[in-house]
């Protein structure tokens, strides 16, 4: 038959996680009938109920008990009950909770029952009306169980030989039974372990325990308790159980030796772990194995002498002598030695001082029990067994972090008067522990020396934090009169989980399991020691299951940190960090948070760099395309010169097809109704807001105006360009011919007059007598009609298209504005800066701000727009003070064209020309063009504009050289250098290319 069901269930039950302090009994509501668990916790049954042993947990039933039965639990159901109890315990439920009662009742409802003829029951908690005969029976049975237990377990602890003594048998005295009111000390070690499990609390008064709780001791085989089979972990559990059992023994007033370490009330105290015991009794100096005072012979002699020197041994009855022999035989390792020492003298023992009196309800029974010598000797030997466990338990304990304690509970002493606590006070959450501590050193004391008492209060100053360290493992449950006791305020703690952070992200579950297995190997614990193992990114998290070593998560973390190199070598992982965090804060570990932040930063950095590179690449591409457009035209023109029969013919045919497919209608221009227009009308085809004064804006490339150029004009332009590109010397020949050309007539007598000579800027450029602008002398401030300005006719000899004039001199500014007013001019084209290299090219003939008066003409600056670095636009109001008329005049000032030179690019000048023509569109007045002398730069601009205007109007033929001769017939010196003439040809070619691109496809 296997171990009893309560033992297996409760040994495997982990300690509960305290959710909160226990509520008073009144707060739990009315007690339900038939509650379960009364064998392990008192106070469950009502005043009219008794606890019936059902073979599992115990059930409360009303008196008289009519229906008694036991559950027959198969192995599968046993495992299921274990899992259920573990879940309830970890959640924090106790037997007092209705939820626990419902869950356990539901689990037991499916189990088979075996009905009994007589029920085994015990009264409610702390009831003094127990059956005295039943209590005496189990008192003797307890002594027999203790003898058998010592005989079995002392060899297992390697303290004595495994050979049992021949006379280690005891009989049961059915006639001698203790009185009722006996204390609740457990009969044997396994019963004690079962009753001090996490979910249960032992009852204040003993119930009649079932026989099967004692049967395992007589049925266990020697090999079942062999250290080779069970290993170090079973030794540690047994050591803790034995130590706690010896601490549970309660003395009477006249006991020769105190037999308990923690004097509790009816509730049994929390069992000390092996670690706590090793800390409670300090080990003697030197190695335990080498010390001569710790050999087995000396221990046995001391134990046997104490037993035989009892003064009342000779007066024992026959049955009690057998009981004493049974105890002596249970602790002897050698039969011969035991018989030799059984008649030696005993040591004198004096009772230690007692600070608290026994409970009133137990006084009668204890006084009667003191008279029993066997009871005295058994309890005294139990105390000596505690000292043996102190010295021999330490070598069996695991090394390393097991002795390290991370969490502490504050311990407070209570000086309240002694009184019996009510049920509400028992469940109040502050546990009162009345305790007296005694320690006897068997190995260092001298014979006939009086043992020195050691108070529990003194020991708790240094040892209490270690003894009560783990609040999650076992909870102290003893309550009694508070006089001289201790108050332990058990504070609920948030569930903690340990984590080990590695350099692998993500960490595979297999690697995480391997890492925890290696940690378990270092701690010498099984893999099941760790629960809830999870992998979160690069970290593995875990919880420490309930264990007899009282090992906490902090101990495991310290062990992992101390053995970091060993773990890395065994698993191949890089351990970055280990620690403890609340369960809810494990989602983002420090390394994960840092890694996520760095990842975001790196990602944003790369995106920014990519955007910057994209913008730079697009800008470079656009620049290259625009820069190469000029060279594409030159390449095309060069290709036309190299092979005129191919590209030229194809371009001409394409132009013909386009013009035949789409022939735009001639646009009719509305009549010019007024010479006075607003500034806004000059810069756009439609109304637009007038620009603010002296503002600047960027320029835009004006698209060429839609041309009326037909197929014949296209043929003429292509043929002319083809001829110039094919014949390299044609340009030079044409320029030589132009230089030799003499205009007829070319008389300049008026300009050469003495009164007019100061009005000429250059003697090389004088107006022809037949082609000059005549001012109204009556309006002139000098009563003169002369000004160095020439009208340039195009196709209508009556209306000049341009007026080419020199830059005004300080003496001719009034004449210049008079010419502007009398000619009705609205557009002025200025092609020179005011000065070049310190040489004055033109006088500043307009106001910088406000207005200036020149004779009878008031000029008011309205606005000044800087369109680009090459030119700007100014707008003026011109008022005739004699007539009070006002007109608007716009000046286009080109800044980057110097004397005897050409602009840096044709593109800027062509854009400038388009801007001028856009403002001039729809007007019939001439355009005033001037530079410094009014011939070189002014002639080049007029030549380009005149040729392009003819092409746009659909001229049937075009000859640039002939056009220049036509200009020189009207003003001398037009286009002064060969470079200016070549620049005019290039500008015309580029504008033709732009017109061809603008034609509808």
From Swiss-Prot:
Sequence motif Leucine-based sorting signal, residues: 990-996
Tissue-level expression: Detected in brain. Detected in pancreas islets (at protein level). Detected in pancreas and brain.
Amino acid composition bias (Polar residues), ranges on this chain: 674-684
Bilayer disposition of the protein: Single-pass type I membrane protein
Active-site positions on this chain: 931 (phosphocysteine intermediate)
Keywords: Acetylation, Cytoplasmic vesicle, Glycoprotein, Hydrolase, Lipid metabolism, Membrane, Methylation, Phospholipid metabolism, Phosphoprotein, Protein phosphatase, Receptor, Signal, Synapse, Transmembrane, Transmembrane helix
Compositionally biased region (Low complexity): 394-404, 691-705
Protein name: Receptor-type tyrosine-protein phosphatase N2
Species of the source: Mus musculus (Mouse)
Gene designation per UniProt: Ptprn2
